[in-house]
Amino acid sequence: MMTTTFINGMDISFLDEIEQGGGAYYSGAEESVENAEDLLYILKDNGVNAIRLRIWNDPPGGFCNLERTLIMAKRIKEAGLNFLLDFHYSDKWADPANQSKPKAWENLDFTGLTSAVYEYTREVVELLKSQGTMPDMVQIGNEITPGMLWNEGKVDGEWDTTEQWEQFITLVQAGIAGAKAAASDLSVMIHIDRGADHPASRNFYDRFFEHGVNFDVIGLSFYSWWHGTLDDLRSNLNELAERYNKDIIVVETAYPWTLNAPEGFPLIVSEEKQLHEGYPATVEGQTNYMKDFISVIENIPDGKGIGFYYWEPAWIPSQKEWSVGHENGWSNLTLFDFAGGKLDSLEF
């Protein structure tokens, strides 16, 4: 179970690949090999108390699979940090645009798919438990607003039917049951991407409550350039807390510290018009944005806002080729400079 301490979390799922590719991190002014430090301890020394990792079933690039997750989990726990495990139930990114099944599950019928979700989830949690690195929380699926494990669990567009929702929820419940079979007191999060969209958030979670899905935490993504303003976020989070009486975590967020791209690297956020009003793309602007963002969560009624996770704050442009098959467009949305030096915004 997670502690009651406010979660200052970071998703650093790329760390394993960055380190193996020669990337390094520094908390001091001297960014040289002999001054490199373990990222986990830099984060911890600056107020971070929890780490999120994604897990893919059989990723082509070999990172974020079970074997590598077991290794990273040991490092997280050795550093004295809490651990959130993010099941994608895919061999690659699972998000609102893609929720493809693992290749090994493609030909299973629905009963077989449901069983596979249960057994895989149980096995992963049991293996983590057996090596003394039990997650403090798991999330069943990643940004599953449109469902997961398409097409059996797809619920957007023409797939938004009663039958499809029942199948989707059956798959989610199989994941929850698998996690609970391995650890009955394990906290479970259900994560969607609509941090500032109350009608969509309510439509989704109403379905889960109507079906009696047993979960502990509402998880939301919030990126201002895609989702809206901090006022929009505040309104949605406060209404969700009142409606469902569940703990809430904003489990993905980020903000730029510059709009200047490192040479040869495109950026997802590269224009002034993508910025939130009042927060320039500077280290100071990023710092102020994060302070105000955290304040929104801390002030959710009845203490229901229990924390946040910053998505890939350490995805520095240390290499051109990545196992995920696309470029790094995130290097100005980090809490480290392009060379791996800690920014002043990394203080919680």
Show which residues each predicted segment covers.
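Conserved, mostly hydrophobic/aromatic
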Residues: 10, 43, 86, 124, ...
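Short, solvent-exposed beta-strand-terminating loops
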Residues: 12-21, 83-95, 248-264, 306, ...
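Acidic-and-aromatic substrate-binding clefts and catalytic sites of carbohydrate-active enzymes
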Residues: 19, 23-34, 57-67, 145-148, ...
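Aromatic-rich peripheral "rim/lid" segments of glycoside hydrolase catalytic domains that contact
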Residues: 20, 27, 157-158, 235, ...
